[in-house]
């Protein structure tokens, strides 16, 4: 197990938050506390057509989110941050086998990344109250 404190922040982007999310201010505050205490911070950002294109305002991280010097960034195109990205290579290169995860959306991208990370042998801790989602209609 690594001794570095590693925090992975998923999809805390302007475009993602165009849909209202639960307790945004509290969630961001807790994430900022985590990133300030971390040795390594990895920001995961989703890209897709329709407002989340790389370089767009929608793709950018929330302005109130603390981005420490030396933070690492991974761009993804699917819910799972490991799928067709350089995340696993980055973790291997950095000697990271465990991390704390937080961000948006609890029931989609955070969940998919946790499941796929654990299946690859990573030890993942979910930061309580440092993840959020939107109201979603129940399936019919």
Task: Indicate where each model-derived feature is located.
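Long, well-ordered, tryptophan-enriched scaffold segments
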Residues: 44-45
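N-terminal nucleotide-binding beta1-loop-alpha1 segment
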Residues: 8-11
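Active-site-adjacent betaalpha module
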Residues: 1-6, 30-36, 40, 52-140
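Short glycine-enriched, charge-decorated loop/helix-capping segments at active-site entrances
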Residues: 20-26, 51-52
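Short acidic, Gly/Ser-rich segments with clustered Asp/Glu that frequently serve as metal-coordination loops
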Residues: 13-19
